Amino acid sequence: MNEDQFPKAYDPKSSETGVYSFWERSGMFVANASSEKPAYSIVMPPPNVTGILHMGHALVNTLQDTLIRYKRMQGFEVCWVPGTDHAGIATQTVVERHLKASLGKQRTDFSREEFLKHVWDWKEKSQNVILSQLRQLGCSCDWSRQRFTMDPGANRAVKKAFKILFDKGVIYRGYYLVNWDPILQTALADDEVEYEERDGWLYYIRYQVVNSEEFITVATTRPETLLGDTAIAVSPEDLRYSHLIGAKVVVPFVNREIPIIGDFSVDASFGTGAVKITPAHDKDDYKTGMNHQLPMINILTPTGEINENGGIFTGLSREVARENIITSLEALGLFVKKEAYSSRVGVSYRSGAIIEPYLSKQWFVSVDSFRDSLRGFVNSEEIRIFPPEFVRNYLTWVNNLKDWCISRQLWWGHRIPVWHNKHDENVICFDGEGGPEEVMRDPESWYQDPDVLDTWFSSGLWPLTCFGWPDENSLDLKKFYPTAVLVTGHDILFFWVTRMVLMCSAMVDTEPFSDVFLHGLIFGKSYREYDEKGEWFYVSGERKRDYDKGKALPKNVVAKWEKLSKSKGNVIDPIEMIEAYGADAVRLTLCSCANRGEQIDLDYHLFEEYKNFINKLWNGARFIFGHISELTSRDLEEGVNQDLLGLEDFYILDRFNELLDLIDGHYNCYSFDKIASLAYDFFKNDLCSTYLEIIKPTLFGKQDSDQQRATKRKLLATLLINILGVLHPIVPYITETLFQKLKATLGTVENGKGDSVTGHAVSMLRSEACMVAEYPKPIHVAFPQGLRESFGIAERLVYTIRNIRGEMQLDPREPLQAFVISSEKKELVDVCIPIMCALGGVKTVEQLAEAPKDSIFSLGVVEGIQVGVILPPEHLAKERVRLEKEKTRLEKSIDSVSKLLASEDFRTRANPSLVQAKKDSLRNSQRELQSILDKLASL
């Protein structure tokens, strides 16, 4: 074969760019909203424009592209909409850091418009990199429909949705205790707060009762908030304090008199049984304050410093204020003690700041009216969640859903479309262009709300905005909405998935997608090195790479699977992996790992393993090309003579049909790992290691007729075309490259359609590309009765020969001489002999009536068929040992099955077919044991 036409090694770099350009140039990614084909649509979870793609992006987009390519080949009008997310807090934070590092300036050094120009510039650069990387991965998105969560269409949709909810009274504005990030100076939703267990202190502080010499002691983790105390609470059932309920105490430093109240929410066993109530800075205290109509005093500035309500502590940070207050309490004799105490602390998922419960006026979405529909979509299976274990998580979250804080004190994002009157409480919600008519007439009296919407508000509308809503006449909306499936990580089931269901169903009264597949989160291997003091640090750089490649770990280094993190040194860059192993190897690795668990352990050796498979695919195809190069498409159009098909041919066709059936089932439930494994095993084991090895003597002219050889070649071409189709959704680059080589080799398809064996391959060859070819279908032939059983016997005969070779330590390169004894299955043995020779490394196999008396041989029995391997004289002792082992195994098996069959409970309750199978198994084992005993006796 010409090296230029078909190089010995596959080079991803030399083909991937050209193949992708061919697809894109040919318009194969573009969806047609006017098509009569059934629709299949996906909207890409938009990557944040904060940087570049990470391995999680590579995973989710590989899985989506696999589905899109599969459905495209099945004849659906597929539409995969790509896009990026403005990611309000995240992007603003990144840009602020960039400006600080590059220009030495803060956000507040710019006007709002100037700062936003910097953010838009950042967005353009980041988005271009992200989209380029998606192309490298092989994503077959419809780039003509590319969207951004702050593009004009998205902005129209966001304003429209806000006004719809505002007019319904679902959106409201009010004072509420929010999660405040003092670094980013914005409110966060409850699910944007991460909780960490942290060690701290429990402080005991005394408050003097007014007009009394008595004191009441409380325990608190946050003594600085006493400046905002408005009550002391005790349990009404706590006899220690019942006489004090209704009395008042004095708050130190601010000299405010506050009541002692009785409240059943107080845990009398915690601390002293008395707790301070600071409604403006604690969520539980807020509820108590509302129930008792207590004042709510905010003591903090937006930056986390003590405000004017803090008296002498005004201007201090929370941390410094705490220290000064404790010192001052000690001086006044009001500090009792402190105890070590561990508590859950809320931390901002973006800035890492300790979250401050903060009384603030914010915009909210009331969720009560949505709760039933959110449950109903999933309970009725209008939305199916995969894996189903997450249904419970979803429903639990919906049941505990609280009003959603949607305002953010940021500059980057969708500005809230509400105008406030400067002179009264009037507000106008407006969803049109420009501003409301009242504002245009008297602009000096109005101002637009300065806050922006939570990123998840616009992301919640993503499936709608991608297809043109709120334009109800949009062809895309009519054709492609609702979408088929949402593929995303399980970690944003609450952040995003539920909010999409809420927002989209509120706008158009239907679910945004039919299915949700929640993949696991990627974990990488990190290495902790411990020093003599027991302290540890993460290993990085060359040493880590050596460990990843299998270098033995020292005793003081421990490997651990952890979420990918730069600080842990276990980040795996998908683009680096593509450069090193090729996009197909990366995609296959990710698919093979995408099980239905919550964690995906991603190891470097997997990329190496699947790169080897890509090379195996190339080399296997190259071998086949060497034997079909003289074929033309016309040969395939003529079909094959099924009378010339052998057992091995029927076997491989049956295995292929079974593969299609299994893979289709796994696509339906998003078992990507099983799809990858099945396709991998079929090509590597069934096609290459089994079928090709069996037919090599025919291909090389060592056995069978010219007509049989021609039939095998047609079948090989047919199988290769079809398996390329099966593999294409996962490994599109190499399959497209090989498909184009097949088209060039076999030539233009004429008018013939082929037969039931070659017909679909002929149909695929008519396609411009593998990507748009029809997905393979089962190959229909008259399969012989008992095919699987017959080939199974052939495989077991081969296994027996290989087992004898191994146990006798015979040279694996030395062809063996074997014989077979079977009075009942001579025809089957005749069919099995070529398979035994090809796969068992046997030179000759004779059918005998009895074992040769003048030879030393090792004997095995398969389904009553005795198979023997002639041995050199020196192997007599080894054969006796082998037979004794086999005798022991069979005796144990016979004893176990006999006991089972002796059980009346088993015989009466078990399926009759299972009982019969056990009887047959017992009979075969007894026959095999007798053969072993006879052989031992002869030795």
From Swiss-Prot:
Molecular functions (GO terms): aminoacyl-tRNA deacylase activity; ATP binding; valine-tRNA ligase activity
One matching Pfam family: Anticodon_1
Keywords for the protein's UniProt record, in alphabetical order: Aminoacyl-tRNA synthetase, ATP-binding, Coiled coil, Cytoplasm, Ligase, Nucleotide-binding, Protein biosynthesis
Top-rank taxon, per record: Bacteria
PANTHER family the UniProt entry points to: VALINE--TRNA LIGASE, CHLOROPLASTIC_MITOCHONDRIAL 2 (PTHR11946:SF93), VALYL-TRNA SYNTHETASES (PTHR11946)
Entry similarity comment: Belongs to the class-I aminoacyl-tRNA synthetase family. ValS type 1 subfamily.
InterPro entries, A to Z: aa-tRNA-synth_I_CS (IPR001412), aa-tRNA-synth_Ia (IPR002300), Anticodon_Ia_Val (IPR033705), M/V/L/I-tRNA-synth_anticd-bd (IPR013155), Rossmann-like_a/b/a_fold (IPR014729), tRNA-bd_arm (IPR010978), tRNAsynth_Ia_anticodon-bd (IPR009080), Val-tRNA_synth_C_sf (IPR037118)
Gene name as annotated: valS
Subcellular location: Cytoplasm
Subunit text: Monomer.
GO cellular component terms attached to this protein's record: cytosol
GO biological process: valyl-tRNA aminoacylation
Domain observations: ValRS has two distinct active sites: one for aminoacylation and one for editing. The misactivated threonine is translocated from the active site to the editing site. The C-terminal coiled-coil domain is crucial for aminoacylation activity.
Regions annotated as coiled coil: 874-939
Record's protein name: Valine--tRNA ligase
UniProt short sequence motif 'KMSKS' region, positions renumbered to this chain: 563-567
SUPFAM superfamilies according to UniProt: Anticodon-binding domain of a subclass of class I aminoacyl-tRNA synthetases, Nucleotidylyl transferase, tRNA-binding arm, ValRS/IleRS/LeuRS editing domain
EC number: 6.1.1.9
